[in-house]
Amino acid sequence: MKFCSKCGSSNIEFKVPPDDNLRRYCCNDCNSIFYSNPNIVVGSLCTFEDKILLCKRNIQPRLGMWTLPAGFFENSETLKDGAIRETFEETGADIKNLQPYSLFSLTHISQVHFFYLADLVEPNYGPTAESSEVELFT
């Protein structure tokens, strides 16, 4: 961090602020403290007739790799709404009966991943801007 996003000062220091125990970027001019917290990724493990829906990534990172539909959680939504949105964006599929399934802390990339177990409403899915292929696998 080179400049304070509150006052524009370049008087930034990476230090432990008062009453804290972790180093953070602090502005020495306006006394703002900047917290770096993990990003939340939300997704779904979708099933239909004992098969799992996977999508082949059409974007970086991991271009060309098969994965579960998932993406970054938005401020204005619930985790469940985020899983529904991401599944539709990446596969074109509608899902139902969402139940919490797994939670992973990926500290090496500062992310928390939350997945739901879900059912496909019907087997309508296909490629999207984010996925070059979408298929059900056994």
Where are these regions (language model features)?
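A short linear hydrophobic-aromatic micro-motif
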Residues: E13-F14, L54, N97-S102
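Short histidine-centered beta-strand/loop micro-motifs
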Residues: V16, S36-N37, R57, Y125-T128
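Short connector loops at helix/strand junctions that flank enzyme active sites
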Residues: L22, N37-V41, T47, P61-L63, ...
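A short beta-turn/loop motif at secondary-structure boundaries
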Residues: D19, Q60, F104-H108
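Unchanged
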Residues: F73-T138
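Conserved Nudix-box catalytic region and its N-terminal flanking loop in Nudix hydrolases
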Residues: T47-E89
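Acidic, metal-coordinating catalytic segment for phosphate/diphosphate chemistry
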Residues: M1-G43
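Conserved hydrophobic/aromatic beta-strand scaffold that supports enzyme active sites
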Residues: F3-K6, R24, L45, L54, ...
